[in-house]
Amino acid sequence: MIEIKNLHAEVNGTPILKGINLEIYPGEVHAIMGPNGSGKSTLAKIIAGHPDYTVTKGEIFYDVNFKKINILDLEPEERAREGIFMAFQYPVEIPGVNTSVFLRAAFNEICKHQGAEEMDPMDFDDYLRSKMKLLSMDDKFLNRPVNVDFSGGEKKRNEILQMAVLNPHFSVLDETDSGLDIDSMRIVADGVNKLKNKNNATLLITHYQRLLNYIIPDYVHILRNGKIIKTEGKELALQVEEKGYDWL
């Protein structure tokens, strides 16, 4: 589904990623851990197409709908239409834009790209409410501006609601556990787990092992100084929790 080959990237002329190689297949959950400044969020933002980061070498191939494309050739909105989703560490507030209207516009944009009919407001309302139940979200969210005056937990749940509504092929969750109490983390993790199937894949970016108690990864990768230095199963996260990163 996603193949990252020899990816090098910089910001403001400073090298951040120094040769990332990673393959993620449908049905898999991968987690990337690493100390602060190792390049974890940089990798997430490059996959999403953030303009502040410059790729100096490498490719990111993405298989979808029987075609293989280098997403580095696509604008951020084109990547989203092709089924790539990113949940931000710090979700953006959009004053004046109703959450349900925002989600319906995004959903119908993907429908249009796929050649499907757009969903009318009444049908979309039913669809949206069914997804909200996955995250124990109150109907009051529907009429609130996107992320405005939301608590940290509400913002993260709203990000996963977007993931549920848009049904992406490949999702990147950038430190989704950041700022969450244990109850909110369980709700968010439960929503992510319910969305997992054999046709999609997820990349978790996290600093701590605790999220991986609730979303079990198939593989854990340790990123340090811009390179993946070790890959194993979930037990690697437990070792990092116990020993830190210096032993690697």
Predicted feature descriptions by range:
Residues 33-35:
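The feature captures the beta-strand-to-loop junction immediately N-terminal to the Walker
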Residues 172-176, 183:
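Walker B catalytic motif
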Residues 48:
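Helix-to-loop junction immediately C-terminal to a conserved catalytic motif
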Residues 24-26:
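Conserved hydrophobic segment flanking the Walker A/P-loop of ABC-type ATPase nucleotide-binding domains
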Residues 77, 82, 89-169:
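ABC-family P-loop ATPase nucleotide-binding domains
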Residues 2-4, 17-19:
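Conserved structural motif at the start of ABC-family nucleotide-binding domains
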